[in-house]
Amino acid sequence: MTRREVREHTFRALFQKEFYNSEEYPEQYQRYLEDPVFSEDTDAAAQMDDATREYLTGRVASIAEKLPELDEKINAVARGWKTNRMGKVEVSLLRLATYEILYDEEIPEKVAINEAVELAKRYGTDDSSSFVNGILGELVKKQ
């Protein structure tokens, strides 16, 4: 599975988290892992193996653990917006990309931003990609 596919699954897990409380989410996440929805771009043979599931679970847990800090960083640069007022797609992508920018040294900032923008084009509204790009650009400038 490519990094892009893992990133998309991470986004989907974070997006899913927005709809469930802390008691319900673990069960829903397990269901997702048992039968992940693959995109039309994904080769059907590229099924999620155990190592990928483990990596994905660790990554989602690490991001979830840092949500208050990630939201604080996003809120500091999102003029006129707070994460609690943003769309679920946008906030999930912003959290993922902010995590990658701040904590994942293997992913260049430009790659994190570009991938978030591409996912915003795919899953968000017409304005999502520019919204995500603008906030992440400000975040990188201010750090």
Give the positions of each predicted feature.
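N-terminal interaction/assembly modules
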Residues: 1-129, 133-143
